[in-house]
Amino acid sequence: MDNAEAEQKGRYPMLALSDEELLKAIFSELSKSVGSVADPYSEDGSYAAAIGSLPIGLRAMAATHHLDISLTMDDIGWHFLNFGEPGLVRETEVGLRELGLGEIAQYFAEAHAIVNPLKPEIKEADDYYRCLESRGLMERINELTDKASATQPSLDGSPIYAAWIRYARGHPEKVFTF
């Protein structure tokens, strides 16, 4: 370990944690920083505004967290039905790129271009599938979801959380705010 690494570990003791423990520390930092300040499901832009003052790395993590959940529970297109506020969409794409997930950012942008124009037609869950299938787009959404989910490496099956860990270890000053 060189002097710079030793100094960084002294300043950021959480870097000595395991990946799983570091992920918990990041979630704790996010909870303190964003907490219940704004609702990411809202269309009012408050969530994007709330994360806008965070350090760039923590901001990227706050913006991409909900995409990870969408990839796990739904699909990359459905994400925009829950988290489609334009400011949050921009923050998420920028966040993916900041975290070194350029490929996922491309899949994300393509999925947004597919789903966003159709949102006015989607009133209920069944409408989403019917709308995309009737246009031959559901297969592409599934492909984009599979590609984004399969990006390696992953932590607990998540390429996004693995990127958080890699980023936090490489740039702790852009994540931790004490």
Regions found by a protein language model. Name each.
Residues D2-T64, D68-D74, L81-V89, G95-F178:
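Extended, alpha-helix-rich binding/interface surfaces that flank or overlap catalytic cores
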